[in-house]
């Protein structure tokens, strides 16, 4: 499902215009991104938590030059689904 499809579904279910739904969806995404950039988690009860996970420093290979490189410690965005959400998917996806 794409962002456009999500906006259409929200518009149909709530009766709001697509432009309003677009503003709401984009605002939600922006707030989640801003919070994660500041290393704050976003908890949505019954859905899950958006957070920044730390990746440790590690060694890797540059295959084009055949050299070893150091990949520094960094953060990546992550999503941890709520227990109830995982159960719903487990029991209903066919």
Which ranges hold each PLM region?
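Strongly charged
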Residues: 1-94
């Amino acid at each position: 499902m794409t962002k456009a499809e999500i906006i259409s579904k929200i518009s149909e279910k709530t009766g709001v215009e697509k432009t309003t739904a677009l503003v709401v969806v984009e605002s939600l995404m922006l707030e989640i991104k801003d919070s994660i950039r500041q290393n704050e988690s976003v908890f949505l009860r019954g859905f899950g938590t958006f957070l920044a996970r730390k990746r440790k420093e590690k060694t890797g290979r540059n295959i084009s030059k055949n050299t070893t490189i150091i990949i520094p410690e960094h953060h990546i965005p992550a999503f941890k689904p709520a227990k109830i959400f995982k159960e719903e998917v487990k029991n209903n996806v066919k």
